[in-house]
């Protein structure tokens, strides 16, 4: 009897945990929608001229990793946010210094750990998506690694199945994975997944 009760309790906890991650993910987006969408828009405006990504590498959001990407070379630097070398590096490589500092401040305030863009193709047409990761304090189970919510912003409306999973296209039921992860619908062009890694 006790064994059956334990099995039922564990099953209920697992179901509640899987449901709560979806609720937590969509709630975090809804609660911070304005800030998150602002970060995505700012990044989109800054990125085409000089491609880059930003990631915070410490828990207090004081150390930022700046990845500057060109056709031939990728430079990766790590700075404390207040360090003068950060501004000097941005100026040296002709980045919008004020714009990137604004983005860094917004990411700190919203607890966005990473932002980057990726190119992909659909029917031989180039597409782009922007992914940002958030580290909410609420998603943490006993004996489990920290969890991150990854949001992907597409330029156009996407297709989803009846479970809300991102599909390759309207004409197929094949689930599309990004970086090995299944993404779920928030809006027609914004999806989320829960991941152990922030990038």
Language-model regions, residue ranges each:
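Hydrophobic alpha-helical segments and their boundary regions
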Residues: 6-7, 83, 100, 178
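Generic hydrophobic secondary-structure signal
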Residues: 10, 36-39, 186, 190
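Acidic/proline-rich low-complexity IDRs
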Residues: 4, 8, 12-13, 65, ...
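Extracytoplasmic electrostatic interaction patches
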Residues: 91-93, 97-199
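Low-complexity, intrinsically disordered/propeptide-like segments
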Residues: 8, 12, 16-17, 49, ...
């Amino acid at each position: 009897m006790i064994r059956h009760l334990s099995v039922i309790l564990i099953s209920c906890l697992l179901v509640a945990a899987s449901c709560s991650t979806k609720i937590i993910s969509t709630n975090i987006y809804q609660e911070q929608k304005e800030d998150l969408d602002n970060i995505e828009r700012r990044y989109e405006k800054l990125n085409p001229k000089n491609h880059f990504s930003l990631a915070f590498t410490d828990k207090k959001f004081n150390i930022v990793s700046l990845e500057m990407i060109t056709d031939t070379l990728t430079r990766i630097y790590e700075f404390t946010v207040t360090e003068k070398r950060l501004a000097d590096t941005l100026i040296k490589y002709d980045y919008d210094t004020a714009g990137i500092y604004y983005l860094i401040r917004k990411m700190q305030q919203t607890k966005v750990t990473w932002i980057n863009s990726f190119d992909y193709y659909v029917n031989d047409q180039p597409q782009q998506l922007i992914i940002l990761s958030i580290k909410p304090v609420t998603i943490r189970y006993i004996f489990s690694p920290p969890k991150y919510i990854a949001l992907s912003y597409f330029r156009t409306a996407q297709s989803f199945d009846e479970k809300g999973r991102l599909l390759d296209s309207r004409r197929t039921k094949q689930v599309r994975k990004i970086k090995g992860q299944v993404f779920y619908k928030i809006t027609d062009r914004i999806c989320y997944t829960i991941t152990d890694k922030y990038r």
